[in-house]
Amino acid sequence: MSTPESTPVQEIQAAADALVAAFAEGRLDDYFGSFAPDATFVFHSTPQRLASAAEYRALWQRWVAEDDFRILGCTSTGQLIQHLGSTGVFSHDVETRIATRAGEETVHERETIVFARAEDGSWPAVHEHLSARTTA
């Protein structure tokens, strides 16, 4: 949300920080609430693009039901914000600790999230792209 003293980059950073914190802390209502309803998602771990936040949440619920999937924590590094008019691009490296019935695992990925300024001044995420991070 904009304030008289904030810049768009600060607002985008705040939106990104809130989204990442909600994800890391397992606050799913806050996490999914960070996305516009018609946000799209491209994940290296899924065969198709997800066409809405509801579709992504349904997939997440399936992971929980089938594998007892949960986030144990995540760390965001190498953050970059590009302010482009009414949109902002947030990219970063993310290290996520997850747990499933198979045990715990740490995954290393790169993520790009596109935010768009809404009429109320907030910056909901409208697209997320997650890629595996290579070591090379």
Question: For each predicted feature, which ranges?
Answer:
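Short helix-adjacent coil turns
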Residues: L19, G26-R27
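A short, polar/proline- and glycine-enriched secondary-structure boundary/capping micro-motif
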Residues: T100-G103, T135-A136
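Short beta-strand edge/turn micro-motifs at domain boundaries
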Residues: H108-A136
